[in-house]
Amino acid sequence: MAASEIPMAGYRSKLLTRAEVAEGTMAFHFEKSARFDFKPGQAADLTLSNPPETDAEGNTRTFSIASPPFENHLTFTTRMRDTAFKRSLKKVPLGTQVKINPPTGSFTLHKNSAKAAVFLAGGIGITPFLSIVRQADHDRLPHKLHLFYSNRRPEDAPFLDVLQMLEKTNPNFRLVCTMTEMSKSKKEWKGETGLINQEMLSGHLTNLQGPIYYIAGPPAMVAGLRKMLVAANVDEDDIRTEDFAGY
């Protein structure tokens, strides 16, 4: 059954499924209207109607859309902080109605395929990039895509397996994952460790000044990486950012 339209104000949708995609992180899948057009990398407001509990932060949150446009549902993914909104989202019955507003934002892939895209993601900041790289793969875009993905441990990394599989099947996509707290992990890790820095980028990119950079993650990380890129003589017009605060 298709989601119900609410002209100019988004539409009513239903919660279809939910699942844990990393420790302390859940993905929520909702109906998508055939008229809900969005670009990979955009976000949307999600409002719970009559939730079982509420608090001063209210019943609406803005989430990047983690699913690509070619899928017939919408996925929102979030760290499960202990708030009334997220407790409600975790426990309301499947089939619960919500309101989803029209998509917003311009954190989207550039059109000039001659310039590579370099995505720098921290934790839940992976969500817009997941949508972008999956849609690019689906559309067979010629862009060269490089994703540097930082987490504390493999246990904390949402969609790591999806991205690793995508790298194996798409020659235009390169994935570099790094873990910053492997001493606290119970899993084996053979990839990079430590924070994303200029040395790490230089080890995987032939020309730091050539690509368009996209940075998404905690505000301190975003600010630090932007400063690092500017110091490396990357044109500020080639740096695009999105903060993920409070997640």
Segments predicted by a language model, with ranges:
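Ferredoxin-reductase
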Residues: A2-T96, N151-R153, T180-E181
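Reductase modules of NAD(P)H-dependent flavoproteins
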Residues: E5-Y11, F85, K144, F148, ...
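Short, conserved phosphate/pyrophosphate- and ester-handling motifs at nucleotide-, phospho-/glycolipid
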Residues: G41, G125, P218
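A short, basic/flexible loop-to-alpha-helix module at the beginning of a structural domain
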Residues: P102-S113
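Conserved S-adenosyl-L-methionine
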Residues: A114, H138-L145
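Conserved beta-strand elements of the Class I
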Residues: A117-L120, Y214
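Histidine-anchored nucleotide/phosphate-binding helix
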Residues: I126-H138
